[in-house]
From Swiss-Prot:
N-terminal asparagine deamidase that mediates deamidation of N-terminal asparagine residues to aspartate. Required for the ubiquitin-dependent turnover of intracellular proteins that initiate with Met-Asn. These proteins are acetylated on the retained initiator methionine and can subsequently be modified by the removal of N-acetyl methionine by acylaminoacid hydrolase (AAH). Conversion of the resulting N-terminal asparagine to aspartate by NTAN1 renders the protein susceptible to arginylation, polyubiquitination and degradation as specified by the N-end rule. Signal peptide: none annotated. This is Protein N-terminal asparagine amidohydrolase. Pfam families: N_Asn_amidohyd. It catalyses: N-terminal L-asparaginyl-[protein] + H2O + H(+) = N-terminal L-aspartyl-[protein] + NH4(+). Its EC number is 3.5.1.121. PANTHER family: N-TERMINAL ASPARAGINE AMIDOHYDROLASE, PROTEIN N-TERMINAL ASPARAGINE AMIDOHYDROLASE. GO terms for molecular function: protein-N-terminal asparagine amidohydrolase activity. Keywords: Hydrolase. The keyword Protease does not apply.
Amino acid sequence: MIYVGGVQFLDESSSFSLSSSSQGSSLLVDVMSHPVITLASDSFKNLEEKNVSFDESDSESSTKDRYVYIFQREFAVVNPALVDFVGTDEATTCVGLVIRNRKSGMTSVAHMDSPEIVDLGISQMLLLVLQDDVDAELDVHMVGGYEDVDIKNADGVGDYAKPEGYSFPLCCKLVETLQKRRENFHIQTLFILGHNTKLDSQANTCPIFNGCLVNTSTGAILPASFNRTSRCPDEIVRRIRVSSSFEDSSWKGKLLDTYDTKTDRFIIAPCRWTMRLIEYVWELNQLTDEEILTNCSTSPSAEGPDFVNSLRRNWGYLLKYPEWSKTFPRRQPRVFERTVDGHWKKC
């Protein structure tokens, strides 16, 4: 169930004979328009974005603090005794979801990219966050999911009434699922859709922020961006798993396992890819940069400057190593442990 401002949020739409999608839409509209949520969004909007970089030439570079970074469709549960900060970015039509146990400080971050992974995904996130205490008080933050299309007022409910585009259905599903579950979810930040949308110089809608960083000790959240030095470890393989997981039935409806909470190690669970994916990648790699942006992004006008380059790096790896067993010998995970200087090394 959802709480806003310490008060249980009553879903009035559930008492009416509305379809499930209409109920979800109405609930999302009501929560987003709550004065507490609106004020929190205005405050978040005025925060300075934290640029996380481990480049030695960068004045903001810092590996003294212990970071965990999450890619698309991944999740991690971190212990504040072992990790200082956990975050994600590149969430345009995706949503960075944070769930933190107020008592223990155990924090889970997921990069949700589809309504189809929300139900199982939230269950995965909560497994270690709850620590067998189903009555725990949980703080929740959502960042990303900008308004990627013009949402029409189809039935008089509000600006977000008609589910279109990619962001809206995902945001609806997230809020609806939290409301239906028995755990106590205190919504602190809902920086999504209209709250997280601006116009660029060409009058295209784009996100104000597409990432966030959580201080595990305090629970404070900041808008954040990362780069190639801080999106680690094993960036390319972890990115490839997102595409290949669609062909691997063992990952259906699930978030990707990434990080071991107890040992503070990245354990990149194996994932298979087929020759069909390799052939498809070869065809995509023949496209121009503009064609790649148009065909491979849910939000072409909102992607970062390194979007196409990242895809070409991923495809280059797949074309070089078309057999998944070369990356995951004997179907064993790729394991990385933290070094004394804050970086990661492969075990």
